[in-house]
Regions:
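Substrate-binding N-lobe of the ribokinase-like
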Residues: 1-45
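Conserved phosphate-binding/catalytic loop of the ribokinase/pfkB sugar-kinase fold
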Residues: 50-87
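Short hydrophobic/aromatic-enriched beta-strand-loop microsegments
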Residues: 11-15, 33-39, 137-148, 195-200
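Short, conserved phosphate/pyrophosphate- and ester-handling motifs at nucleotide-, phospho-/glycolipid
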Residues: 4, 143, 210
Length: 216
C-alpha cells in the first residue's frame, strides 16, 4: 500500500492483526493516510527483525512464528474483502499464511475474487503458490528461487527462467513476473517476453523489494 501510494495509486490494506504490534501497524498506516480494513484477533502480531551488516553486506532475518488463525476467522476476512470488491478491481494476495490456515486458502481466495470480477495478483511460495496456481490467478510474481523450487530444478539462465514462466502461462495464467534481484526482472505473457535489467544502485536492504515489484 505504501509503494502504491508513492506511485500515485490507491489501495486498501486488508488482513488480520493482533495485540499491541497490530495496533502499531494500524496506527502507522493511519499516520500515512492509507486506507485499511483489519480484523483483530487475540494474541500478538509477530515481529520480524532484519539485521543489516553494512561491512559484510549481509542481511539476517529473525522471524517470529506468529499467531494461529483458524479457518472461520479467515472466512470472515474473505467476506470482508468480497464486500469491498467491484468488477475490475485488483486484489493482491501475498506472503505466508498464519498457523491454522488451510493449505488451499489461496486457491479458495483466488476463485472467490475471480467470481466477483476482480483480477488477482498472487505472490507466494511453495505449496501455497502451487495451490493458488490451480485457480489460475491473473498474475503471479515468483522470484527466481521460488520459480526454481516450483519447477524442481535450478533455473540459472534467462532462457531457462523464461521457459519456466511460459509453462505457467500455458496453465492459464495471463501474466508472469519473475524478479531476479540484481539481475532485474522478466515479464511474460502469451505472446511476449520482456527483460528489464536492474538499476545500478547502492543496496541498503532487499527487504520489501519483491513487494515493491508487485506494487509497481
Amino acid at each position: 500500500s505504501k509503494v502504491i501510494a508513492k506511485l500515485g495509486g490507491t489501495s486498501k490494506a486488508i488482513g488480520i492483526l493482533a495485540g499491541n504490534s497490530g495496533k502499531a501497524i494500524q496506527d502507522a498506516l493511519d499516520g500515512e493516510g492509507l486506507a485499511h480494513n483489519f480484523r483483530f484477533v487475540p494474541g500478538e502480531t509477530r515481529t520480524n527483525l532484519k539485521v543489516i551488516d553494512p561491512e559484510n553486506h549481509t542481511n539476517t532475518d529473525i522471524n517470529e512464528p506468529g499467531i494461529e488463525v483458524d479457518a472461520p476467522e479467515l472466512t470472515a476476512l474473505l467476506y470482508d474483502l468480497l464486500k469491498e470488491l467491484k468488477r475490475g478491481d485488483i486484489v493482491v494476495l501475498a506472503g505466508s499464511l498464519p498457523k491454522g490456515a488451510p493449505k488451499d486458502t489461496y486457491y479458495t481466495w483466488v476463485e472467490s475474487c475471480k467470481k466477483a470480477g476482480a483480477k488477482v495478483f498472487l505472490d507466494a511460495d511453495g505449496e501455497l503458490l502451487a495451490e493458488g496456481l490451480k485457480a489460475a490467478p491473473y498474475l503471479v510474481k515468483p522470484n527466481n528461487d521460488e520459480l526454481s523450487r516450483m519447477m524442481g530444478r535450478e533455473l540459472k539462465t534467462l532462457d531457462e527462467l523464461a521457459d519456466a514462466g511460459q509453462a505457467l502461462i500455458r496453465r492459464g495464467i495471463e501474466h508472469v513476473v519473475v524478479s531476479m534481484g540484481g539481475r532485474g526482472a522478466l515479464y511474460l505473457r502469451k505472446d511476449s517476453v520482456i527483460y528489464a535489467p536492474a538499476l545500478k544502485v547502492k543496496v541498503g536492504s532487499t527487504v520489501g523489494a519483491g513487494d515493491s515489484v508487485v506494487a509497481a
